[in-house]
């Protein structure tokens, strides 16, 4: 059972989502509807985008805790560019470029300067957050044009253009990681860095690419945030890094690298967003969200560690059981002298 759960984390997350849907459907019959599903998906888009980027980084056995700050910085970038008179496309592209540069800088710190990822990104978390506050003077950005809001306006099947782009990115990343040699390089890098290098994998390039794409996904999340609410607070992005990591771990992405899928991370993000909707349904204050996210992350990490230890212990027991069985069989196996009395008599005579 434990081995099944360990090997089917995506299915476990999906089962948890369906179970929660069923329970909430019993409490409120209007909850179980297509409208509710699309509403949760719309709310989950920011976390889904962050989970996609975090997956790439975590697969390489690294972690990035600066994505919340990058999200806020890029949201401020697109807002300031729009208020300065730039077009929507140019402003969004500029924000994506800022996110990519921020992620690339993280990758340089980790890959070339050999700074541990958690230490490097803790530093850039403060750096990017401080830069965001310097640009805004600690004030909110308001008065954004209506064009930005249109990105989150439903157009087809109650899904916005950003929603369709998010689904396209999910499919593209799932295909990339599961069906290409480049995608498998992420798993190889995280599973065994030295072994991957000996096989010809450009591990430094893979890790820098992972951090850069993480920055791009954070920038896109910042654009989604600005388009959904129509203004940019001075604390945009706070706490999102914890939720992104929690979503990935919940969906089966290992902190030790080399294990997990994009689909699992997406299901984890969807489940966390669904939990937030439960808090709204129960009319709990908004500040419970971070507490619940931290509690879920801690619980999943403890469960994941205990589950991994139990599976490894079970595998060791099976190995030792086979070894013991083979030893017993070899001890009971008759020798040549036992089957041949004449050979036994000759041996005794020789003695």
From Swiss-Prot:
<feature type="transmembrane region" description="Helical">
    <location>
        <begin position="284"/>
        <end position="304"/>
    </location>
</feature>
<feature type="transmembrane region" description="Helical">
    <location>
        <begin position="213"/>
        <end position="233"/>
    </location>
</feature>
<keyword id="KW-0472">Membrane</keyword>
<dbReference type="GO" id="GO:0005886">
    <property type="term" value="C:plasma membrane"/>
</dbReference>
<feature type="transmembrane region" description="Helical">
    <location>
        <begin position="39"/>
        <end position="59"/>
    </location>
</feature>
<keyword id="KW-0813">Transport</keyword>
<keyword id="KW-0997">Cell inner membrane</keyword>
<dbReference type="InterPro" id="IPR001851">
    <property type="entry name" value="ABC_transp_permease"/>
</dbReference>
<comment type="function">
    <text>Part of the ABC transporter complex LsrABCD involved in autoinducer 2 (AI-2) import. Probably responsible for the translocation of the substrate across the membrane.</text>
</comment>
<feature type="transmembrane region" description="Helical">
    <location>
        <begin position="93"/>
        <end position="113"/>
    </location>
</feature>
<keyword id="KW-1003">Cell membrane</keyword>
<keyword id="KW-1133">Transmembrane helix</keyword>
<protein>
    <recommendedName>
        <fullName>Autoinducer 2 import system permease protein LsrC</fullName>
    </recommendedName>
</protein>
<comment type="similarity">
    <text>Belongs to the binding-protein-dependent transport system permease family. AraH/RbsC subfamily.</text>
</comment>
<keyword id="KW-0812">Transmembrane</keyword>
<dbReference type="GO" id="GO:0022857">
    <property type="term" value="F:transmembrane transporter activity"/>
</dbReference>
<feature type="transmembrane region" description="Helical">
    <location>
        <begin position="252"/>
        <end position="272"/>
    </location>
</feature>
<comment type="subunit">
    <text>The complex is composed of two ATP-binding proteins (LsrA), two transmembrane proteins (LsrC and LsrD) and a solute-binding protein (LsrB).</text>
</comment>
<dbReference type="Pfam" id="PF02653">
    <property type="entry name" value="BPD_transp_2"/>
</dbReference>
<feature type="transmembrane region" description="Helical">
    <location>
        <begin position="70"/>
        <end position="90"/>
    </location>
</feature>
<feature type="transmembrane region" description="Helical">
    <location>
        <begin position="155"/>
        <end position="175"/>
    </location>
</feature>
<feature type="transmembrane region" description="Helical">
    <location>
        <begin position="115"/>
        <end position="135"/>
    </location>
</feature>
<feature type="transmembrane region" description="Helical">
    <location>
        <begin position="14"/>
        <end position="34"/>
    </location>
</feature>
